């Protein structure tokens, strides 16, 4: 058929591969290129190569005909049959080209501006109504049927920060002078990264119990520990209460962690409540199978570093899990105390204590890493599942590469959980431990768009774990849902946590009320 391809500004570069494919498929391609002046009409020779006809339009008449792009498009429509119109360029140009095509009953497609902050639909910056349904340009587009686009809504969303941006442009921002802290390497170099010195990175902690003699010694003190208190005495000990920030002070900050953490004395007292069951059902309730009685009894014994070491044998994120895992539905829900109408042992609090103690002591160690298998494994997403999988695989000797769509590693741990619940510095330490163990991280990479699964396979990856997370929010389809400053919980949390939008000095602040 006959296709009119209307390109404006840098949209000409975007439309070139499309018109090329249309021409190669046997279509008649008529290209209408536009700009304010000759200097802004780019890639004309490239477009001519794959077009049956090229019409140039400039606002000032310095190149081709004088007029806007719709003038050139309408001339073509009036002289011959057109089967399709495609427009890529400034939003206002796409809107009126689409309206023109609609006027003549011609199907038309536009390529919308993703106004992308994160490229995953999490920030909501490109959320629009398309055909009465909520869509994200960065995920569902960028090409859409122009007749279905709510253009008024789109222009309102694009102007959300217009006034703020104008003010910022007038005053130099000192932050612009700071260098980026990105250190991720190019995708093309993933297979060529220098291998981590495994002997150094897996320098095993001094406290790791591995010899028969050490095991026998532990069994001796474990037996003695059990005899110190009778089960009834242990169950009679009240469950520890987590110390918290003073409410009056808490109201003045959103970055300081509300739960302060246990003292060593509190942790040892809570550890006494554990009955050291011969068949611990709490372990069955733990998704990663942490040796719960083992690490708790080491806390009761006062050996906090060994408790942390035991945690890291099976968990890649002990400091994180100790804070945000739903222990009340997992390990603690299987605690024997509950059968005796007593509160469960505070397993989560103790896990956090051991991990925090090791970090704050400055004596952090790494778990054992098996000799390299030479097998490369890709992980899609750096949220809790991706990081946990990466930790498990690197300990087994696999070469693990984690691909993250956002600009920071951590997934929901960074964008979805406020810092007063889970500080970023805690997450960063866990990530750094994985990096020291040999895990490679690549940010700003959307698997499926930036790089495909087939390309990963071509790069030598023998296994691919997809931990992309829950993703997009669900919408109810009610009137006003896509109005400006109406945010889903995902969008709100992403902007506040990952983009510091609660700070009015940031690029994309949240202004509510």
Which residues does each predicted region cover?
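N-terminal Rossmann-like dinucleotide/flavin-binding domain of flavoprotein oxidoreductases
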Residues: 308-318, 350, 412-461
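FNR/FR-type flavoprotein reductase catalytic core
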Residues: 1-117
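Residue-level detector of alpha-helix initiation sites
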Residues: 9-12, 91-92, 122, 316, ...
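Rossmann-like dinucleotide/flavin-binding elements
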Residues: 15, 21, 272, 279, ...
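Redox-cofactor binding/interface segments in oxidoreductases and associated redox assembly factors
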Residues: 5, 87, 466, 488, ...
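Extended interfacial segments that mediate partner engagement and assembly in macromolecular machines
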Residues: 2-4, 9, 13, 357-396
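Ferredoxin-type iron-sulfur electron-transfer modules and their immediate structural context
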Residues: 142, 150-200, 205-373, 424, ...
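Short, flexible loop segments at boundaries between secondary-structure elements
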Residues: 107-125, 492-501
């Amino acid at each position: 058929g006959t296709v009119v391809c209307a390109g404006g500004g840098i949209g000409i570069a975007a439309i070139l591969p499309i018109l090329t494919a249309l021409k190669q498929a046997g279509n008649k391609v008529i290209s209408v290129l536009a700009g304010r002046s000759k200097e802004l009409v780019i890639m004309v020779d490239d477009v001519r190569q794959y077009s049956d006809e090229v019409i140039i339009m400039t606002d000032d008449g310095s190149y081709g005909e004088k007029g806007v792009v719709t003038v050139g498009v309408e001339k073509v429509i009036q002289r011959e049959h057109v089967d399709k119109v495609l427009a890529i360029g400034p939003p206002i140009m796409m809107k009126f080209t689409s309206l023109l095509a609609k006027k003549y009953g011609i199907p038309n497609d536009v390529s919308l501006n993703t106004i992308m902050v994160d490229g995953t639909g999490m920030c909501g910056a490109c959320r629009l109504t398309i055909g009465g349904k909520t869509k994200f340009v960065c995920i569902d587009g960028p090409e859409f049927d122009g007749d279905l686009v709510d253009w008024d809504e789109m222009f309102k969303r694009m102007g959300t920060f217009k006034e703020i941006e104008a003010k910022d442009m007038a005053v130099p921002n000192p932050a612009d002078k700071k260098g980026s802290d990105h250190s991720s390497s190019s995708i093309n170099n993933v297979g060529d990264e220098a291998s981590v010195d495994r002997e150094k990175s897996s320098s095993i902690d001094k406290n790791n119990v591995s010899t028969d003699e050490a095991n026998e010694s532990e069994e001796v003190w474990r037996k003695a520990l059990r005899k110190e208190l009778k089960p009834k005495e242990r169950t009679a000990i009240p469950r520890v209460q987590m110390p918290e920030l003073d409410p009056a002070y808490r109201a003045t900050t959103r970055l300081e962690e509300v739960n302060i953490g246990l003292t060593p004395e509190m942790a040892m007292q809570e550890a006494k409540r554990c009955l050291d069951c011969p068949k611990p059902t709490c372990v069955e309730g733990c998704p990663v199978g942490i040796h719960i009685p083992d690490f708790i009894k080491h806390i009761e014994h006062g050996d906090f570093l060994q408790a942390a070491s035991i945690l890291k044998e099976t968990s890649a994120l002990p400091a994180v899990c100790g804070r945000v895992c739903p222990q009340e539905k997992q390990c603690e829900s299987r605690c024997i105390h509950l059968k005796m109408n007593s509160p469960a042992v505070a397993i989560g609090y103790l896990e956090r204590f051991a991990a925090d103690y090791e970090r704050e002591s400055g004596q952090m160690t790494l778990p054992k890493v098996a000799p390299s298998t030479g097998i490369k494994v890709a992980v899609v997403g750096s949220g809790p599942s991706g990081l946990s999988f990466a930790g498990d695989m690197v300990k087994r000797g696999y070469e693990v590469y984690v691909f993250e769509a956002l600009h920071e590693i951590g997934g929901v741990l960074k964008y979805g959980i406020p810092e007063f619940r889970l500080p970023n510095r805690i997450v960063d330490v866990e990530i750094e431990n994985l990096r020291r163990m040999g895990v490679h991280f690549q940010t700003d990479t959307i698997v499926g768009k930036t790089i495909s699964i087939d390309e990963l396979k071509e790069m030598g990856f023998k296994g691919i774990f997809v931990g992309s997370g829950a993703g997009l929010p669900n919408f109810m389809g009610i009137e006003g849902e896509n109005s400006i400053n109406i945010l889903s919980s995902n969008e709100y949390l992403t902007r506040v946590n990952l983009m510091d939008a609660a700070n009015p000095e940031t690029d994309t602040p949240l202004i509510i009320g």
